[in-house]
């Protein structure tokens, strides 16, 4: 779950946001302006918005008769996980799928957003350095925050973990305070002040803020600010390392968690099939060649792994990739066997055949207009198209024993990646991926996209991670949470060493920042063309902007509270909830009556 709570939003504002920027299933929560202490859940249902009142009894939160929860967060999480449970009074199912988030209150990396006290304690105690701190959202009081600090005292006696102190940070009238007379304009000002003075507890003991615990999660729409933060040098005089170095080093230290078996690649009969002796596929995710003689050891082996986008749910049709090493003379036939059995129609090659005099990949296709047999398959090069950044080959593949069964395969070779480092700017890579995705989307029954470079981990990992993040943002919206470090960890759990260098790590950030900036501009143009009263459902978005919507900000409103609809949960009695309308909404087109 992410930051779906909007402190200063009226019902009319919520309706405007959800209609103008949301998609079906987008939702947000806000304080009730009718009943102090209660909350409202506003949900986009088709082209309309439903407002659901949430009761805060003082002991629990519920939907006036639904399940009861200790916190607002638990209530929202329950109904997002239990799809189909919420119904409108006319039986229309209400889906909570995509949170419409507020901006982060700060771009500082010590802000972790949505995090429980237990999760904060686990992180800080694992760090083990007294006076390490972070700031997170308050789950018990939405709109407030918590400063979690690792003390220098054990929690329960000698040998036990250090105690974590949680200090509530209240946001009152747009100012921040931990209580007392001191108030601050921003969270950053508050933290900077108490880094200098410490915080005195009621007992008289002091809590100090000495070492921030940095987050890698970021609101996608705020990634440009995060890039600026990561480019800053450390404050200490003995080092000039920037945040990108810190994050990448932290990622490298976590590589020990991915020590999965790689026994197949180590077999003597398979050693000649590996371009580099220590870059081997994990057994649990390796591509197994089908139809091979089981009596021949290693005959089903190829140095390639399936890579699944686990950022999206099973109902969101996330792409699957195959990450492979570049072909050797001994593996070309196996490569075409893999492409055929997986029904892959798009191959992405991110290297030249030779770079700086070194062989990177054996050409596994014939010259233009030529046909060649590779094992049991015939491959014909029907044509090549050169662009500034890449070359596109159209290949036809068929089994030698069935020439009438022909598949067309599009081979995209990126030619502008420098021999060392990364491209100077990401525009070429983003355009390249846009063409690839348009092709893949035009082939509804196509199998995984095959991506390879030379070793199949550096450029290959970089391209796959960028594409995964773009797909995630395009599905969930520009204000969704992304975590580049954790995304790479997820990919590395499927193939070892994906994303090899700090430069590649930073390039992913820069590429996603440019993708978001470009998408924002395209979305603004589309919205201006449709006019302010436009409905998302009437807009045809480009593939890379599917479901994209702009970020909501924490803005106050003078509007009054508006419509609530009677609502019930399945197997619960229908509650009678009186509709509340402001005078200017009496004849609003926002009525939720369904046809």
Swiss-Prot record:
It is found in: Cytoplasm; Nucleus. Substrate binds at residues 419, 453-459, 500. It catalyses: O-phospho-L-tyrosyl-[protein] + H2O = L-tyrosyl-[protein] + phosphate. GO terms for molecular function: cell adhesion molecule binding; non-membrane spanning protein tyrosine phosphatase activity; phosphorylation-dependent protein binding; phosphotyrosine residue binding; protein kinase binding; protein tyrosine phosphatase activity; SH2 domain binding; SH3 domain binding. The modification Phosphoserine is found at residues 10, 57. Its EC number is 3.1.3.48. Residues 4-100, 110-213 form the SH2 domain. There is a cross-link at residue 308 (Glycyl lysine isopeptide (Lys-Gly) (interchain with G-Cter in ubiquitin)). The active site is at residue 453. The N-terminal SH2 domain functions as an auto-inhibitory domain, blocking the catalytic domain in the ligand-free close conformation. This is Tyrosine-protein phosphatase non-receptor type 6.
């Amino acid at each position: 779950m992410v930051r779906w709570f909007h402190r200063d939003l009226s019902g009319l504002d919520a309706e405007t946001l959800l209609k103008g920027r949301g998609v079906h299933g987008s939702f947000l929560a806000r304080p009730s302006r009718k009943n102090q202490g209660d909350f409202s859940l506003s949900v986009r249902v088709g082209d309309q918005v439903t407002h659901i009142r949430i009761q805060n009894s003082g002991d629990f939160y519920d939907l006036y008769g639904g399940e009861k929860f200790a916190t607002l967060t638990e209530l929202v999480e329950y109904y997002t996980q239990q799809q189909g449970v919420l119904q409108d009074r006319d039986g229309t199912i209400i889906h909570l799928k995509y949170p419409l988030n507020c901006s982060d209150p700060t771009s500082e990396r010590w802000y972790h957003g949505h995090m429980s006290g237990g999760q904060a304690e686990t992180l800080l105690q694992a760090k083990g350095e007294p006076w390490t701190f972070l700031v997170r959202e308050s789950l018990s009081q939405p709109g407030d925050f918590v400063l979690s600090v690792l003390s220098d005292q054990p929690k329960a006696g000698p040998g036990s973990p250090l105690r974590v102190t949680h200090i509530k940070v209240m946001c009152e009238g747009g100012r921040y305070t931990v209580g007392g007379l001191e108030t601050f304009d921003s969270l950053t000002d508050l933290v900077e002040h108490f880094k200098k003075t410490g915080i005195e507890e009621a007992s008289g003991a002091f809590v100090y803020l000495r070492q921030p615990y940095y987050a890698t999660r970021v609101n996608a729409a705020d990634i440009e600010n995060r890039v600026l933060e990561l480019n800053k040098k450390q404050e200490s005089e003995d080092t000039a390392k920037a945040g990108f170095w810190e994050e990448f080093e932290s990622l490298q230290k976590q590589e020990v968690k991915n020590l999965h078996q790689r026994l197949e690649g180590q077999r003597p009969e398979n050693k000649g099939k590996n371009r580099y002796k220590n870059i081997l596929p994990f057994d649990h995710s390796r591509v197994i060649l089908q139809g091979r003689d089981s009596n021949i050891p290693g005959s089903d082996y190829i140095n390639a792994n399936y890579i699944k986008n686990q950022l999206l749910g099973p109902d969101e049709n996330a792409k699957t990739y195959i990450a492979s090493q570049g072909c050797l003379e001994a593996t070309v036939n196996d490569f075409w066997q893999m492409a055929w059995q997986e029904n892959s129609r798009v191959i992405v090659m991110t290297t030249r055949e030779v770079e700086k005099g070194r062989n990177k990949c054996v050409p596994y296709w014939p010259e233009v207009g030529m046909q060649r047999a590779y094992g049991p398959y015939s491959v014909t090069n029907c044509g090549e198209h050169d662009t500034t950044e890449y070359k596109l080959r159209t290949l036809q593949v068929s089994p030698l024993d069935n020439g009438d069964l022909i598949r067309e395969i599009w081979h995209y070779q990126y030619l502008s990646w420098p021999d060392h480092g990364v491209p100077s700017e990401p525009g070429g890579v983003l355009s390249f991926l846009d063409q690839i995705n348009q092709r893949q989307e035009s082939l509804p029954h196509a199998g995984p996209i095959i991506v390879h470079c030379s070793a199949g981990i550096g450029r290959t990992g970089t391209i796959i991670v960028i594409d995964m993040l773009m797909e995630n943002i395009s599905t969930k919206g520009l204000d969704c949470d992304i975590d580049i470090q954790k995304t790479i960890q997820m990919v590395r759990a499927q193939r070892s060493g994906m994303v090899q260098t700090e430069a590649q790590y930073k390039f992913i950030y820069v590429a996603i920042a440019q993708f978001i900036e470009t998408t924002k501009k395209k979305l603004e143009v589309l919205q201006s063309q449709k006019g302010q009263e436009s409905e998302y459902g009437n807009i045809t978005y480009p593939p890379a902007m599917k479901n994209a919507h702009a970020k909501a900000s924490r803005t106050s409103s003078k509007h009054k509270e508006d419509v609530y609809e009677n609502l019930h949960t399945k197997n619960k009695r229908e509650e009678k909830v009186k509709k509340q309308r402001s005078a200017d909404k009496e004849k609003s087109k926002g009525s939720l009556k369904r046809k």
